[in-house]
Swiss-Prot record:
Task performed by this protein: Enhances the incorporation of serine into phosphatidylserine and sphingolipids.
Gene name as annotated: serinc
Residue spans crossing the bilayer: 10-32, 44-64, 95-115, 126-146, 153-173, 195-215, 234-254, 265-285, 301-321, 383-403, 430-450
Protein name stated in the entry: Probable serine incorporator
Organism: Nematostella vectensis (Starlet sea anemone)
Record family assignment: Belongs to the TDE1 family.
Length: 456
């Protein structure tokens, strides 16, 4: 009897494991969630993979974990005195390498998928048990890579990837601001209430208030020094301030409003605040300690600081936003996150089977109970988003996590025995802040400069 019960238990566990390897895993994850699309639930699961990598990276920065990692010979072979503070950064490099390799693999594997009938579409939306093992295996395998030049080379990959992710993050922020503005304006027009207009004005003034406060703090902490004139920092702050003013003026210019009625100060305030954040983030790692009010703080503070916390929170919020925002008319869709063949299907009303109706397939409509909570297939007419580009974005997000959690430090020497501020990191962030503003200004000017072209 015991053997029979044991066999039944094993069979039950095997069945449950097999279920997790199929497409039904997403629907099982959404058992307690409202009705959602299969494509959305899939992206949320991949976002959870990224969140897991972020959590693991934060954990390995903890002092207790560092002590355990110190026992791995090649990690601390030459670091000696500073190993206790460095090994955490090495671990983050390796965790994020495994994370990036996992998403890069799926980015290449899913390249060119345009139909849900493609066998690779089944891989994208299913086999979650195998993916979990592959995901964990990639992270563990990264710890067995010989040190050599790994840290130095991988840091430059991180700089490039972080720069690209900052630009993608800008597009997501612009789309978020447009959506926010359109939503509140629409509610104001529907209800006829001025409450929404007041809220819109308050949000805009609040954003600009943070911008002004941020600019003042930048001048106080990064330009005042008795030993140095800090001309470079003054130029960075002043130039970005001018760009913010230009963008704000253009956003409400009559010619721009005529061709782009959706533009407004709310969007400009969000982009301006993001520019101030990037400027602060860049100047915080200025190698000249005479012109860096946070120099001593960053040198003595191990692990995450306020800038890293803000960075990773903003990053993850934007990734989740990209996971649920797929309309082809949005900036997310124009970025490549939405499939053109699927755009018409997104505008049609999707009918969800009621209780008692027959489900179509494992990846079709999935009934989740009598309360109407279920995951339904929205990719019959084609894929709802670019699988490859979504994984590419997550790969860049992994590199951004790595650089943010390691404070954009530059390893000196192949043994990572010394850390220093990187002038390259400063210029990467400053250049990204300029490019962000220039891209936004171009989106305002282009419809007015080229009226014959469709920029809707």
């Amino acid at each position: 009897m015991g053997a029979v019960l044991g066999a039944c238990t094993a069979a039950s566990c095997a069945a449950n494991l097999a279920c997790c390897c199929g497409s039904a895993a997403c629907s099982l994850c959404c058992n307690f969630c409202p009705t959602c699309k299969n494509s959305t639930s899939t992206r949320i699961v991949y976002s959870i993979f990224l969140l897991f990598g972020l959590v693991v990276s934060c954990i390995v920065l903890a002092p207790g974990i560092r002590h355990k990692l110190n026992q791995i010979p090649y990690l601390c072979e030459h670091a000696s005195e500073t190993c206790d503070s460095i090994v955490g950064y090495l671990a983050v490099y390796r965790v994020c390498f495994g994370l990036a390799a996992f998403f890069l693999l799926f980015c290449l594997l899913m390249y060119g998928v345009t139909s849900s009938r493609d066998v690779r579409s089944k891989i994208q939306n299913g086999f979650w048990g195998i993916k979990i093992l592959l995901f964990l295996g990639a992270i563990v395998a990264a710890f067995f890579i010989p040190q050599g030049k790994f840290s130095e080379v991988w840091m430059y990959f991180g700089l490039i990837g972080s720069f690209l992710f900052i630009l993608i993050q800008l597009v997501l922020l612009v789309d978020f601001a447009h959506t926010w503005n359109s939503s509140w304006v629409g509610r104001m027009e529907e209800s006829g209430s001025k409450v929404w207009a007041v809220l819109l004005l308050c949000a805009t003034f609040l954003m600009y208030g943070f911008c002004v406060a941020g600019i003042v703090c930048l001048y106080v902490y990064f330009t005042y020094s008795q030993e140095s004139s800090c001309h470079t920092n003054k130029f960075f702050i002043s130039f970005n301030l001018i760009l913010c003013i230009i963008a704000s003026v253009l956003a409400i210019h009559p010619k721009v409003q005529e061709r782009l009625p959706t533009s407004g100060l709310l969007q400009a305030s969000v982009i301006s605040l993001y520019t101030v954040y990037l400027t602060w983030s860049a100047l915080s790692f200025q190698p000249d300690k005479n012109c860096n009010g946070f120099y001593e703080t960053h040198i003595t503070l191990a692990g995450m600081d306020s800038q890293a916390i803000i960075g990773v929170i903003l990053m993850f919020v934007m990734v989740v936003y990209a996971s649920v925002r797929t309309a082809s008319s949005s900036q997310v869709g124009k970025l490549g996150m939405s499939s053109p063949k699927h755009s018409s299907a997104l505008d049609k009303e999707t009918t969800v089977l009621s209780e008692g109706d027959e489900t179509r397939s494992d990846v079709g409509l999935v009934e989740e109970g009598g309360e109407g909570r279920r995951v339904y297939d929205d990719e019959d007419g084609g894929v709802a988003y670019s699988y490859s580009f979504y994984h590419f974005m997550l790969m860049l997000a992994s590199l951004y996590i790595m650089m943010t959690l390691t404070n954009w430090y530059k390893p000196v020497g192949s043994d990572f025995s010394k850390l220093q501020y990187s002038e390259t990191a400063v210029w990467v962030k400053i250049a990204s802040s300029w490019l962000c503003q220039l891209i936004y200004i171009w989106t305002l000017l282009a419809p007015a400069l080229f009226p014959d072209r469709d920029f809707s």
